[in-house]
Amino acid sequence: MKKSYKLEYSKGALKDLLKLDNSVSRVIYAWMKKNIDGCENPRAHGKGLASNRSGQWRYRIGNYRVICKIEDDRVIVLVLNIGHRSKIYDE
């Protein structure tokens, strides 16, 4: 039986989502739910990050980026940050 990954949001990611325009946050939430929640390979939709974000993955949704950590042992995708592409990597 193949494992399907569950999507979880950190407190910071939920704060980021609430700061965004309502229409943008709905698009991001819907995309994550459709493509990542319950999928068998969350790495297929994203790109691995390097340097100080090594071990993290990013998903491109329009001009916004979702930074995640994929935890294979717990079979979850933990959303860490959500933001505009011009500011998401400044943190």
Please identify what each model-predicted range represents.
Residues 34-58:
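A short, surface-exposed loop/turn module that caps and links secondary-structure elements
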Residues 1-11, 15-19, 23-26, 30, ...:
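Enriched for short, Lys/Arg-rich terminal
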